[in-house]
């Protein structure tokens, strides 16, 4: 993610005092500069929020894929030794590939 340090806090915005000029107003340049800072901060927050939403959706997708692969592994296990011995090499290779994929997905999702 990009730089997430914000220049202003809610307290800074609330407590901001603008210097008054002799014409009973605020210096336009100071107000414009302050509003530019606010716009920059809010744009950063919007970008970060979009990134969080995107990552959350990707995380949910990967979790579903991990669960589907676990179910495939659980249902592909032979129920007795006879079928296991006849399909041992192909089933074993398939299960190893599935387990490797699950492991990689868990690392991606959970950071393990």
From Swiss-Prot:
Protein encoded by which gene: gpsB
Keywords: Cell cycle, Cell division, Cell shape, Coiled coil, Cytoplasm
UniProt-annotated stretches for the region Disordered: 75-97
UniProt record, GO biological process: cell division; regulation of cell shape
Listed Pfam families: DivIVA
Gene Ontology, cellular component aspect: cytoplasm
Signal peptide: none
Coiled coil: 42-77
Alphabetical list of InterPro entries matching this protein: Cell_cycle_GpsB, DivIVA_domain, DivIVA_fam
Protein name: Cell cycle protein GpsB
